[in-house]
Each structure stands twice: as structure tokens, then as C-alpha cells.
Amino acid sequence: MPVSRIAVGAPGELSHPDTAKAAVAEFISMLIFVFAGSGSGMAFSKLTDGGGTTPSGLIAASLAHALALFVAVAVGANISGGHVNPAVTFGAFVGGNISLVKAVVYWVAQLLGSVVACLLLKIATGGAAVGAFSLSAGVGAWNAVVFEIVMTFGLVYTVYATAVDPKKGDLGVIAPIAIGFIVGANILAGGAFDGASMNPAVSFGPAVVTGVWDNHWVYWLGPFVGAAIAALIYDIIFIGQRPHDQLPTADY
């Protein structure tokens, strides 16, 4: 059972060189992802006079986030595992693939990467508004939580199937592409309703820069619940019993 493999970790992990390298890698990957993803939305709005919320804007956001996440995961895979998402890190922790100590380090790096990316966007665009996540008219907070749970479940299930599963074989090569694709597809499904975050850090950066925190908890609760469910289901049903080990940095 995954619960038996959950590890708090030792304080010494905080000062280990590999942990520091992994944190820097997560910071940079998140910066790349948020700068390209959020920046594409800002550029589309500028070019279309505020058309970022149109169907074409949704398609552009889906494509930009899919491509950016593919790159962000790929460049971080050999160093940190390329989580680029606090929910993915939480799913790895629930499945016994990363210690709590190291997970906290990842979370801090991911959140900082998102904030810095949004600040750089604001500076580079001369003060243009960075789009914060919000619920569309008629969408309640708990409706959005369900959206985030289901979408993040799909994301983390994909992560486990293509990157974490020790039986993945050559399938691991396409992990960054598959992960980017599921995020892009989910944006097409949920973007019009709650922005389709699936990633607390992606929501956190714009909230810090804009000061808009309305329903921000939705973008933490939903992804964390979805990630935990996916990790438990995949680990219990498809991976089964195995000794506790750290998430291999060579794959994800």
C-alpha cells in the first residue's frame, strides 16, 4: 500500500546538493512554463483587443500551455523529475515516491518560479495586466472544485502511467509530450468554466501579482484531491507492492 511507503524524510535532505539542484530546476521549469503560458494569453488579448476569453483564445491558451509544459517537463526531468506542479509533487508523495521534506522544497521552488514569471511578464509588458484565475458566471466554487479534481486526476494518472510506473519501458520517452497533451486537452474542456488550472502554482503567481484571491482555495483543493486519488488508484491497482524508493530523476 502506498501509505506504508510515505516518508517524512530526514532534515539532512534540505542541505543535500541534489535537493538544491532539484529546487533550482523546478524553479526554472516553472518560470518557463508560466512565462510562456500566461504570456501567450496576455499577447493574445493585446492582439485581439481583449479577445483572450473567446473560443480562439481558448485554443491558443491550450496550445501554448501544452507546448510550454512539454518543454518545462523535459528540461527538468533529468534533474528534479520535472514535476512543474505542486499537485504532481503531492501525488508523488502520496504514492511514496518522494519524501515530505523534499516535496516541501519543491513546492517552495515552484511557487517562487510562478511569482517571478508573473513579475517578469508585468515588467516586460510595461505593466500589462497578468490574468488571474477566476470562475465564469454561473460556475460555483464547488463546481470548479469538481472540474479541478477530474482534470488533475487525468494529469497525474498520465504522469504515473508514462513516467512513474516501473513497467513503463519505452513509454517514458513520450512522458513530457503526453503530459503536455493532457493539460492542453483539459484546458479546452475546463478553461471556459474556471480557467482549468490543475496546478496551484500557476494560479498562485498571478494571484500574488494582481492581488486577486477570489476563490483561490479552489485551485489548491481540487488539484490536490485529484492528484491524491490518481496516485492511490494507479499505485494500488497497477503498481502494487514494492519497496519505498525515491522518484527517479532520470524519468520524471
Swiss-Prot record:
Topology with respect to the bilayer: Multi-pass membrane protein
Listed InterPro entries: Aquaporin-like, Aquaporin_transptr, MIP, MIP_CS
PROSITE patterns: MIP (PS00221)
Keywords: Membrane, Repeat, Transmembrane, Transmembrane helix, Transport, Vacuole
Motif, NPA 2: chain positions: 199-201
Tree of life domain: Eukaryota
Expression triggers: Circadian-regulation. Expression is higher during the light phase than during the dark phase.
Classification via CDD domains: MIP
Main location: membrane
Motif (NPA 1): 85-87
Family: Belongs to the MIP/aquaporin (TC 1.A.8) family. TIP (TC 1.A.8.10) subfamily.
Role this protein plays: Aquaporins facilitate the transport of water and small neutral solutes across cell membranes. May be involved in transport from the vacuolar compartment to the cytoplasm.
Protein name, as recorded: Probable aquaporin TIP1-2
Protein species of origin: Oryza sativa subsp. japonica (Rice)
Protein's gene: TIP1-2
